[in-house]
Amino acid sequence: MKTKVTIKDIAREAGVSTALVSFVMTNLRGGKTAYRVNKETTAHILRVAKELDYQPNITARNLKYGKSGTIGVIFSDISNPFFSEIARYIEDESWQCGCSIMFGSTDESSEKLGKLVDVFISRGVDGLIIVPCEGPDEIIDSIIARNIPLVLIDRETSGYPGHSVVLNNARTAYELTYRLIAKGCRKIEMLSYTMSLTNIREREDGYRLAMQEAGLADEIIIGRLPHHDTDAHVDSIVKMAVERGADAFLFATNTLAVQGMSAIVRNGYSIPEDFEVACFDRNDAFDIFDVELVYVDQPAKSFAAESMKSISELIAGKVMNRTRIVLEPQIIEAGTFRSRI
């Protein structure tokens, strides 16, 4: 087994003191030292360190400065394509800034969120990026009270005073509804959740506004489904919409879109022949349908980049002018998904 190279080994090989090697390596910034040290001596020490394949003890260095070099990221459901894509990009960002990431999922459970927060804090994370779930705001409030750097993404808690990265949900839902109206649809029903999450409520607001401005206020209908038992209710919601003469559906999430379109097909209807469909987010499950729909491509890469930038600056103690970053999506119209089966 290869023996780990230490600072003493470098000092002995370079013919300098251990203190000088420690000083150079500790204050290294992008190949240069933060303080004035003879350039030739610095270059010599770094060359020897490279030849010996020296690997710094990141944990020890972080402990010295009170940092773990780890950021905790908590999603509502990391298996959701949108969140898993963000997770992938966050990993890429973490490599760029030289930190490690701990991931967790709450399954929309505030109890699980609380436990994950406690675990991550006990592990010494430097900061947290969280998709908050429905429930008491005490968990988020406690993080703020403990002065732990925090960034919320995708959604916020009521009255949250801190940093966040969110989508322009109301404007996006307005635009989706407007696209359906432009196709000639008048009885557009929205399928949403019973949860009082800020992003869901904002999407409902955007739908309402578009319908009202089009003179369709009397046609506004929002069917709300429980998050954990959607399949048991979606068929009845779709059937009632059909009985009311609905000609289009706006789905608040990609999961609802898959479940809703499945119910439409199960009941013998076609998209877009019988119903136009619009939804938030792309989902690979769309590939099993032979449909055309309007959907939102949320900027997962921007969510990752902006949240990592914000949390890194908070950890570094920088004063940030922007606390709430609102992202704009790309709307894909008439995207066609052909069946693979």
What residues fall within each predicted segment?
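N-terminal helix-turn-helix DNA-binding module of bacterial transcription factors
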Residues: M1-G66, R338
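Alpha-helical recognition/docking segments in bacterial nutrient-uptake
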Residues: M1-K2, T6, Y65-Y178, A182, ...
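Hydrophobic beta-strand scaffold residues
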Residues: T18, I101, L150-V151, D218, ...
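Conserved hydrophobic residues forming the short capping helix/wall of the S-adenosyl-L-methionine
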Residues: A49, S94, A210-M211, I264, ...
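Flexible loop/turn connectors
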Residues: V165, N169, E219, D231, ...
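An alpha-beta-alpha
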Residues: L176-L216, T323-R338
